């Protein structure tokens, strides 16, 4: 039987808020729960082709399970117990980023990202089609972050939309803090106050079979 245990009620509430945002963006979304050393990390895909993640203290058994977001949300918000059955039956599509090898690049004021997001939303509304904003707009680099001799990290608009859509920036006023940009050779990560978004920096090449 699948069990998710998050003893701290505040952290259960944080995880519930994370899952609620996931469901609001996509009713059919899945959440992948992975156990760490005394922690549980939740992963979800967003409509922006960006992963969202949040870590809380707790346990999950089995240690790597994918569940429907709606069922997990019900378990967290209705049962309100330390330990709940998060459901089962999900099949995760795609890969997750590595757990190690991340290098911090720089900290960016959350208020600055909020301003960039608002400008991006205005442009997206002007250019939205039947399927929403075009991919070319979402892929536009809106922020370039660099440190020392390391390659610059180019942050596309879709990452900011994911941060905003998941509510990770919170109240992005003057005292909203910073968003930490980290990277590996092929992934980028933006850690904000209430969660993080992750996206591949390098698109995997298709395998051609002759």
Segments from the language model and where they lie:
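A sequence-level detector of short, solvent-exposed, charge-rich linear segments
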Residues: 34-38, 61, 115, 132-135
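N-terminal ordered "arm"
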Residues: 1-57
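A broadly used, surface-exposed interaction patch
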Residues: 51-84
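Long, compositionally biased intrinsically disordered terminal regions
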Residues: 72-210
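Generic detector of ordered, mature protein regions
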Residues: 17-19, 31-32, 46, 53-55, ...
């Amino acid at each position: 039987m699948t069990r998710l245990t998050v003893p701290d009620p505040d952290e259960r509430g944080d995880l519930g808020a994370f899952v609620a945002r996931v469901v609001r963006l996509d009713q059919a979304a899945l959440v992948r729960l992975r156990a760490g050393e005394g922690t549980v990390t939740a992963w979800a895909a967003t409509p922006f082709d960006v992963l969202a993640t949040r870590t809380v203290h707790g346990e999950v058994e089995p240690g790597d399970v994918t569940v429907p977001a709606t069922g997990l949300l019900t378990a967290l918000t209705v049962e309100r117990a330390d330990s709940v059955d998060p459901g089962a039956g999900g099949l995760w599509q795609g890969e997750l980023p590595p757990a190690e090898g991340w290098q911090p690049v720089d900290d960016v004021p959350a208020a600055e990202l909020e301003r960039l997001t608002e400008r991006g939303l205005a442009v997206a509304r002007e250019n939205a089609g039947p399927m929403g904003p075009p991919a070319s707009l979402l892929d536009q680099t809106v922020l370039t972050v660099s440190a020392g001799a390391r390659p610059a990290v180019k942050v596309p608009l879709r990452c900011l939309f994911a941060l905003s859509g998941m509510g990770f920036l919170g109240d992005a006023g003057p005292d909203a803090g910073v968003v930490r940009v980290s990277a590996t050779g092929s992934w980028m990560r933006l850690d904000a106050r209430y969660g993080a978004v992750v996206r591949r920096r390098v698109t995997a090449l298709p395998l051609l079979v002759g």
